[in-house]
Amino acid sequence: MAPSHAAHDSAATAHRIDGRAIARSLDERTAAAVRAIVARDGAPPGLAVVLVGNDPASEVYVGRKIEACRRVGILSFEHRLPAQTTQDALLTLIARLNADPTIHGILVQVPLPSHIDDGMVLSAIDPAKDVDGFHPVNVGRLSTGTGGLVPCTPLGVMMLLDSVIDDMKGMDAVVIGKSNIVGKPIAMLLLEREATVTVTHIETRGLPDIVRKADIIVAAAGAPRLVKGYWVKEGAVIIDVGITRLPGEGGKTRLVGDVAFDEVQHARAVTPVPGGVGPMTIACLLANTVKAAEMRG
């Protein structure tokens, strides 16, 4: 039977890390950087967004990214291609965008249709324009701590941690999730800050006991309410990357994270879902686009 955390002070309330407010602050800095680039180059940075097919979730994400670009003054160039687009045709478009000097960032919305190799397409993007940070060159730079463009969600996670932790040196950090997009990059970023990092996943044996030792918990397993209250020691900082849509009352759906938010109020701080990591991901995409423009000089 799972232990209870009822021994914790029931009146305790964890600090809610406000991802929306931190994202707004980042957007203000990004907008100022865009104005500086316009003053220098005579034109704002350009972001090309490529969507293949009409997956409803992808269309929503793309719409949010286009609107976010408008807010900070980045020019967005939308390329909507039919679902039957061939891989060669997509690679031809990417080659054209790579060569276009008005484009500083290229984002291909994934997942792509099953007949297209995601890895081959993402590897075709110029690493200097790879604002998602997925190109093998940028992955290598991240793993060796030599700069490059960092994946947006992990970058946002670190900014959320920075809002409540001054120095991560020597802290025990547990990452739950081993994806190339989130889990592994976050582990590398935490190592760069000299945290002691353990990477786990839902098949890890004794997972609750491992998590219970952590000062920092990053939950990115895609498993709703996986992290229970008894997994979390008092004073831990929790970043919940998970987002799952579950049936709610009256036929509506509700969004939940990988953390049982109501059970972890004895933590020092925790991100809500929604309103935590999500806003940071798009804000970091914009910041990466500006960084790509600045790196070009």
UniProtKB/Swiss-Prot annotation:
Mention one GO molecular function: methylenetetrahydrofolate dehydrogenase (NADP+) activity
Statement: the UniProt record of this protein carries the keyword NADP: yes
User: Which Gene Ontology terms of cellular component type are present?
Assistant: cytosol
Q: What is its EC number?
A: 1.5.1.5, 3.5.4.9
Q: Name one GO biological process term.
A: tetrahydrofolate interconversion
* Residues the entry annotates as binding NADP(+): 177-179, 202, 243
Q: Which pathway is recorded for this entry?
A: One-carbon metabolism; tetrahydrofolate interconversion
Q: Which domain of life is it from?
A: Bacteria
**What is the role of the protein in this entry?**
Catalyzes the oxidation of 5,10-methylenetetrahydrofolate to 5,10-methenyltetrahydrofolate and then the hydrolysis of 5,10-methenyltetrahydrofolate to 10-formyltetrahydrofolate.
* Subunit: Homodimer.
Q: What is this protein called?
A: Bifunctional protein FolD 2
Organism in which the protein naturally occurs? Rhizorhabdus wittichii (strain DSM 6014 / CCUG 31198 / JCM 15750 / NBRC 105917 / EY 4224 / RW1)
